[in-house]
């Protein structure tokens, strides 16, 4: 490798914006900020968070309830 052409590889702190957890790793960047980490990600914690975006589930159930009596009548 040629000297003085590679970026410096140093210890950096990775900060999670969601839960506030921080840990050290090595990188060529100064500081790393992540949106979600293994401490708060549902896959790793086993806790699933259901997010109902703008009542889409309720709208679907309402449409399905209207269609069900028509299908039963035929």
UniProtKB/Swiss-Prot annotation:
Domain of life: Bacteria
GO molecular function: rRNA binding; structural constituent of ribosome
GO terms, biological process: translation
Family (UniProt): Belongs to the bacterial ribosomal protein bL31 family. Type A subfamily.
Record function comment: Binds the 23S rRNA.
HAMAP family, alphabetized: Ribosomal_bL31_1 (MF_00501)
The protein's name in its UniProt record: Large ribosomal subunit protein bL31
Organism of provenance: Chlorobaculum parvum (strain DSM 263 / NCIMB 8327) (Chlorobium vibrioforme subsp. thiosulfatophilum)
């Amino acid at each position: 490798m040629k000297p003085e052409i590679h970026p410096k590889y140093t210890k950096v702190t990775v900060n999670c914006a969601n839960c506030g957890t921080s840990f050290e790793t090595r990188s060529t960047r100064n500081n790393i900020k992540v949106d979600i980490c293994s401490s708060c990600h549902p896959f790793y914690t086993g806790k699933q968070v259901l997010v109902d975006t703008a009542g889409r589930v309720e709208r679907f159930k309402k449409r399905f309830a209207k269609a069900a009596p028509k299908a039963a009548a035929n």
